[in-house]
Every structure is written in structure tokens, then in C-alpha cells.
A protein has these predicted regions:
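Beta-strand-rich solenoid/repeat architectures in extracellular/passenger domains
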Residues: 1-13, 25-37, 49-62, 74-86, ...
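Glycine-rich beta-solenoid repeat tracts in large extracellular/virion proteins
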Residues: 15-22, 39-46, 61-70, 88-95, ...
Length: 193
């Protein structure tokens, strides 16, 4: 699926693009605005790839920019990602998932998560600049054998704000650039063996 236009999705159960099946590829070139419980792109199947080159804005509880349910899912986020109000920018459920985040990521408000992966052997590469504020979470991985590589500048500010959180055994976070933590925030939270 090649989406080159602007996508606006609002309200629960509304989905901009839905693909059911293995080895799906979705290319989002234009801007996406997802609000009030909607989902921009949803892929159900193994070996899926989503390429997001345009800016993605996600606002509101249960709103999700890109969602993949299946093993070996991959999201390449070249465009900016702005998440607020309890939304999720990227949400993958399945083992061996990979996210390459090359754009600027801004996450604000409690329960807001820029990137969430539920599954083992996940890899997240944050290469762009990240700003996490007001109780938001930049990257959250729930599963064993996870790796987060943070090579971009990260600023985390505000109570309960977290840059990278891993819940599972044998998780690794590699920091290659500056991490700024004013205001009672957490840069890295790793729970597990």
C-alpha cells in the first residue's frame, strides 16, 4: 500500500489503512493525524513492514499511529513523531520486532508512549532527537532479550517521564549520545534479570 496523501483518522475503531496477511508493506509518505482512539495503520500478519516518511501526530487515549500484530514486524519512522494525551505512536505485538526511529520524537502526558513493543527479541534504534515530558514514555519494551540503541540526543523532563523502559530478562540499553534529565525524570528503567 502506497499512501502519498494526508491521512486523518479520528474516533474509536476508525482505521486509516488495514492490511490482513503476511509480508505486507505499507508506505506512508504524507502527514498523518490520529486522534480520539483512532488507528492510522494496522497490519495483522507476520513479516510486515511500515515505512513512515511523513510527520505522524497521535493524540488521545487508545489512539495509535502504526500498529503491527505479528512476528518479525518492522517500522521505519523517518518522519517526525508527536504523541500526546495517552496515545501510542508505534505499537508492535510479536517477537523479533524492529523499530528504526530516525525522525524527531516528542512524547508528552501520562500513558503516552512513542514506541511500544510486546514480545521477545525486540530491537529499537532511536537515531533522532527525542523529547519526553509530563509523564510520557519514549520507548517501552515488554519482553525478554530486548535491545534499545539510543544514538540521538534525548531529553526527559517531568515527574514519571521515562526515556527508555524495558520489562523483561536480558534487556540492554545502549546510550551513544547525551541524556538530559531535569525535573525528576527517569532516563532508563530496566526491570528483569
Amino acid at each position: 500500500v502506497d499512501n502519498k496523501g494526508t491521512m486523518t483518522v479520528t474516533d474509536p475503531e476508525s482505521i486509516g489503512i488495514q492490511v490482513d496477511g503476511d509480508q505486507a508493506v505499507v508506505n506512508n509518505e504524507g502527514e498523518s493525524a490520529i486522534t480520539n482512539g483512532g488507528t492510522g495503520t494496522q497490519i495483522n500478519g507476520d513479516d510486515a513492514t511500515a515505512n513512515n516518511n511523513g510527520k505522524t501526530t497521535v493524540d488521545g487515549k487508545d489512539s495509535t499511529g502504526t500498529e503491527i500484530a505479528g512476528n518479525n514486524g518492522k517500522v521505519i519512522q523517518d518522519g517526525d513523531l508527536d504523541v500526546s494525551g495517552g496515545g501510542h505512536g508505534i505499537d508492535i505485538t510479536g517477537d523479533s520486532a524492529t523499530v528504526d526511529n530516525k525522525g524527531t520524537m516528542t512524547v508528552t502526558d501520562p500513558e503516552s508512549i512513542g514506541i511500544q513493543i510486546d514480545g521477545d527479541q525486540a530491537i529499537v534504534n532511536n537515531e533522532g532527537e527525542s523529547t519526553i515530558t509530563n509523564g510520557g514514555t519514549g520507548t517501552q519494551i515488554n519482553g525478554n532479550d530486548a535491545t534499545a540503541n539510543n544514538s540521538g540526543k534525548t531529553t526527559v523532563d517531568g515527574k514519571d517521564s521515562t526515556g527508555t523502559k524495558i520489562a523483561g530478562n536480558f534487556g540492554f540499553v545502549n546510550l551513544y549520545r547525551s541524556l538530559t534529565l531535569p525535573g525528576g525524570a527517569h532516563g532508563v528503567a530496566n526491570s528483569g534479570d
